[in-house]
Regions:
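Interdomain/boundary linker segments immediately adjacent to catalytic/signaling cores
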Residues: 1-51, 216-217
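Catalytic core segments in nucleotide and nucleic-acid processing enzymes
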Residues: 38-213
Length: 217
């Protein structure tokens, strides 16, 4: 611990003035396969019974400019993993870092119904998200359920991965989920084009890498 002195305060002020001169390019880091692999390896060690995954996604949504809160244990009316909102969009969030993405697609429907019944959020105003560690493959049935929800209920469920949220955060992206730009279903399994359009550049992640932007090959 350093003692506060006039000289040290002066030195701090000088440093802050120099920092303020640094050009801010709204870009923290460049994504690549190696960094993502390291991050995914670390996350795979999370205890599945802990709330660490939910808190991580909550913090990333906050970094993107949204208010976000995870559910409280014992609250029977908020069994959803999280809810988010800002002036443009709001909705339920299902978070699935395991293999049970099919359950997440069904769970998000319960979340939408709960928010309408108990909290008055009309389903048409609920821009629901499913955030997974990796995009599920076609055989798991998740994307077919998402397509059915869209066709039958006219409800678009957007799908994002941990990696996609990290890329958006690293680029200080301004995301309006109400645009439904990250909608993917059985006929279009990728959000790569949507992410590249949003950032106006190519994404430096190999196709299929860790299921970040599309299912693994």
């Amino acid at each position: 611990r350093l003692t506060i002195t006039p000289d040290r305060i002066q030195a701090q002020d000088k440093s802050l003035k120099e920092i303020s001169k640094i050009e801010w390019k709204h870009h923290f880091r460049e994504e690549d396969d190696i960094d993502m692999d390291n991050i995914y390896t670390a996350v795979s060690g999370f205890d599945g019974r802990s709330s660490a995954c939910n808190i991580l996604i909550r913090n990333l949504l906050i970094a993107l400019g949204y208010n976000c809160a995870t559910s409280r244990a014992g609250d029977v009316y908020t069994r959803m993993d999280a809810v988010y909102s800002n002036e443009y969009s709001k909705g339920a969030v299902e978070i699935e870092f395991g293999k049970d993405t099919l359950e997440a697609s069904r769970g998000i429907l319960d979340d939408i119904a709960t928010l309408q019944t108990h909290y008055g959020l009309n389903k048409k105003d609920n821009t629901a998200l499913v955030v997974c560690l990796s995009f599920p493959n076609k055989r798991q049935g998740y994307f077919q359920v998402v397509k059915d929800i869209k066709n039958v209920l006219d409800q678009s469920i957007q799908t994002l991965s941990l990696g996609a949220l990290l890329i958006l955060t690293w680029n200080d992206a301004k995301v309006n989920f109400a645009d439904n730009q990250f909608y993917a279903d059985f006929d279009n399994l990728s959000i790569r084009a949507a992410l590249e359009k949003h950032l106006k550049r190519k994404i430096n992640i190999t196709e299929g890498c860790l299921g970040i932007l599309e299912p693994e090959k």
